[in-house]
Amino acid sequence: MRTPRFRVQAKNVFLTYPNCSIPKEHLLSFIQTLSLPSNPKFIKICRELHQNGEPHLHALIQFEGKITITNNRLFDCVHPSCSTNFHPNIQGAKSSSDVKSYLDKDGDTVEWGQFQIDGRSARGGQQSANDAYAKALNSGSKSEALNVIRELVPKDFVLQFHNLNSNLDRIFQEPPAPYVSPFPCSSFDQVPDELEEWVADNVRDSAARPWRPNSIVIEGDSRTGKTIWARSLGPHNYLCGHLDLSPKVFNNDAWYNVIDDVDPHYLKHFKEFMGSQRDWQSNTKYGKPVQIKGGIPTIFLCNPGPTSSYKEFLDEEKQEALKAWALKNAIFITLTEPLYSGSNQSQSQTIQEASHPA
């Protein structure tokens, strides 16, 4: 009887080298140097130990186009140390996603190129999608989760990308990086007693903080050290020029807020901030409402003038009721001198110019 001629036609090829001690990095280099009918787009090598301790190597190769293999010795590889020849089993891979998942299960892998999504899975069905999303949630980061969904559930990746992107932002939300003050608090050696007392009473962690702490409005000329001092007191949210309450900027676990150079005429959530109110929502222009835990004081920083000063704003005739409320929820201080002495002036001014001129 005539022996069937060896022939494999496929765009994706799966190789298995049984009882193979070749380093996986060497096999990857070997495949990259082969003269093949089509250029590889992606190669992944996996080293797997069977129960008897013998190593096997598996390889997935994705090509630009379908290839025909008639030489069953095409992928034979010689061990770099002992000249032993290793011959693989060669077969077409119906689902690259399933093969890649199999290679990834033990984690001892090396790869080259960009994995090509094929959208075919032998498992299929709802359970496969559930498994893919479970793997995405366990991936540890938004970018890794998106890669998992792109590979395993490409239809959802294309059709639901906007929702996925938004949901994963919230799931893998990272608090803003903590601010590091360029000066220790001791650099500010001309802080009025009233300011020091306010800090001692209101800028505390959640366990020691009053239930409804008082806020403070600090008005003064530029380069008096207001911003640097206010930001040196502890973990805080810094909102300058406009309010951004997105999780990327605003941290619900901060001890206090600093609102710097925001015209009080256009300050959204005036009472929520000044009154240290708890559990309130902010509607965003292009997203879902943001839930603010609140209950922390706010330092309002401003310069004199009709579009900056909170005092001038509250002295307007139409703000009479708001002024009466504000005086019960905040103290107002006007600085006439810098918060630092002459010995600290040069360094403080340099940092102030680099950060914010208020």
From Swiss-Prot:
What top-level branch of life does the organism fall under?
Answer: Viruses
Q: Which Pfam families match?
A: Gemini_AL1, Gemini_AL1_M
Indicate where this protein resides in the cell.
Answer: Host nucleus
Cellular component aspect of the GO annotation: host cell nucleus
Cofactor, free-text remark: Divalent metal cations, possibly Mg(2+) or Mn(2+).
As annotated in the record, motif RCR-1 runs over 14-17
UniProt entry keywords in alphabetical sequence = ATP-binding, Covalent protein-DNA linkage, DNA replication, DNA-binding, Endonuclease, Helicase, Host nucleus, Host-virus interaction, Hydrolase, Metal-binding, Multifunctional enzyme, Nuclease, Nucleotide-binding, Nucleotidyltransferase, Transferase
Annotated CRESS-DNA virus Rep endonuclease domain ranges read 7-115
Residues annotated as binding ATP? 220-227
Concerning Gene3D superfamilies, the annotation shows:
3.40.1310.20
InterPro entries annotated for this entry?
CRESS_DNA_REP, Gemini_AL1_CLV, Gemini_AL1_REP, Gemini_AL1_REP_central
Region annotation (Oligomerization) ranges: 155-175
Q: Identify the main location.
A: host cell
Annotated positions binding a divalent metal cation: 48, 56, 58, 106
List where the motif RCR-3 lies: 102-105
Its quaternary organisation is: Homooligomer. Interacts with the replication enhancer protein (REn). Interacts with host retinoblastoma-related protein 1 (RBR1), and may thereby induce the transcription of host replicative enzymes even if the cell is not dividing anymore. Interacts with host PCNA. Interacts with host SCE1 protein.
Q: Which family does it belong to?
A: Belongs to the geminiviridae Rep protein family.
What is its biological role?
Answer: Essential for the replication of viral ssDNA. The closed circular ssDNA genome is first converted to a superhelical dsDNA. Rep binds a specific region at the genome origin of replication. It introduces an endonucleolytic nick within the conserved sequence 5'-TAATATTAC-3' in the intergenic region of the genome present in all geminiviruses, thereby initiating the rolling circle replication (RCR). Following cleavage, binds covalently to the 5'-phosphate of DNA as a tyrosyl ester. The cleavage gives rise to a free 3'-OH that serves as a primer for the cellular DNA polymerase.
Protein's name according to its UniProt entry: Replication-associated protein
